Structures are given as structure tokens and as C-alpha cells.
Swiss-Prot record:
It comes from Cupriavidus necator (strain ATCC 17699 / DSM 428 / KCTC 22496 / NCIMB 10442 / H16 / Stanier 337). The active site is at residues 80, 143, 168. Belongs to the peptidase C15 family. Its EC number is 3.4.19.3. This is Pyrrolidone-carboxylate peptidase. It comes from the Bacteria. GO terms for molecular function: pyroglutamyl-peptidase activity. One of its GO terms (biological process) is proteolysis. Removes 5-oxoproline from various penultimate amino acid residues except L-proline. It is an enzyme of class 3 (hydrolase). Keywords: Cytoplasm, Hydrolase, Protease, Thiol protease. One of its GO terms (cellular component) is cytosol. Pfam families: Peptidase_C15 (PF01470). Homotetramer.
Amino acid sequence: MRTVLLTGFEPFENEPINPSWEAVRALDGERVGDAVIVARQLPCVFGAAIDTIGELVDVLRPALVIAVGQAGGRAEMSVERVAINVDDARIADNAGAQPIDTAIVAGGPAAYFATLPIKAMVRDMRAAGVPASVSQTAGTFVCNHVFYGLMHRLSQQPDGDVRGGFIHIPYLPEQAARHPGQPSLAQETLVKGLRAAVATALSTRADVREQGGQLH
């Protein structure tokens, strides 16, 4: 049976919970087709987060890796297109580090694209009743850091057959209640969206060709 690794983050920036971890752990052990989902938590710490996901890839040998992170202020689940080779932290991570204009991998490529069928995933997430879109930026905090580190690691795999990517998700309602005016999605909606995303990523190699870009 194939393994799908889903990762979420520990809480950060004084939040008591992180919706990415709450959503992925709800899917831990669930079967999707011929695969089983394994959920693991990452530290919200530069360097350590990449080390942790790299160790998980080595131990679990998954067919698919989807890292998930919180994006407070976004109204939809955002399937990320690209990770860039820079850390530029607006706030400190959970270990107090705040790298600015620092390469994630010295001498590494400027960017990596997700190797998932991102547009097909968005299409099927929407078909399941979940607000979703393709995102053109994963930011420059620990989420992008992990996304880039993951894709760099996967690019070094001998068989090169492990696919990966990143999904940003909004606040949960209980978080939005502490941030007036901020959008949120219920946990059951987030779980439904991730389930649809995993199923499509497992069954689809070639992405659909349809509009998913933005003007700015």
C-alpha cells in the first residue's frame, strides 16, 4: 500500500491552535484508494522544519507529500504553484529566529514548482463544495521554507518519483473570532478539501490546462 505524507505545523504567533495540524491529523490513517494517509506535525522553526520533513520522507518513503500551512486572511484553500529560494521573515519563528533575505539552499535554484496536478486538485476541491484556488506565492516565512526544502529534497531522490507540493488554508472559525473581519473555514470543510486534493493527486499525473492565474 502506498503512503501519502501530510504535514501540518505547530501553532505560532500566539495562536493556541494551527488549522493545518488540526486538519491533517483528522485524516491520519485514512485510506484513499490504494494509499494510506500518514499525518505528522512540523515545528514552526526555520531549518528544523526542513530537517523534520526530510527525515519523514526518508523513513516513510511516501508516494506523495503535501505540506499544509496556515494562511490567516485567505478565504480559500490555496494550492501553491511555486516555492522560492528565500527566507524573509516578517516575524520570528518559534525558536526566535528571523532570517531576512537569506537563501534557503545556498546556490540552489531560484524556485521549484510543485509536482502535483494543482489545477485538477482545485477543480475537484471546488466540485466537493470547498472554496479553493491556485496560489502564486507561498510567502517567505516557514511555509515557503518547508515547501522549497521539500521540493529540493525530492529533486535529489534517486528515483525522482515522489511528488510533492503545498496547500495553505484559512483560519478556523474559533481563530477568526479573535481576529474580527478575517475569513475562516470550518475544520470539516478543510478536511473535505484535503481529502479531495489527495485523491486527485494520487490519480492524476498530467494536470488540466485551464485558467488559474491572477492579474496581480
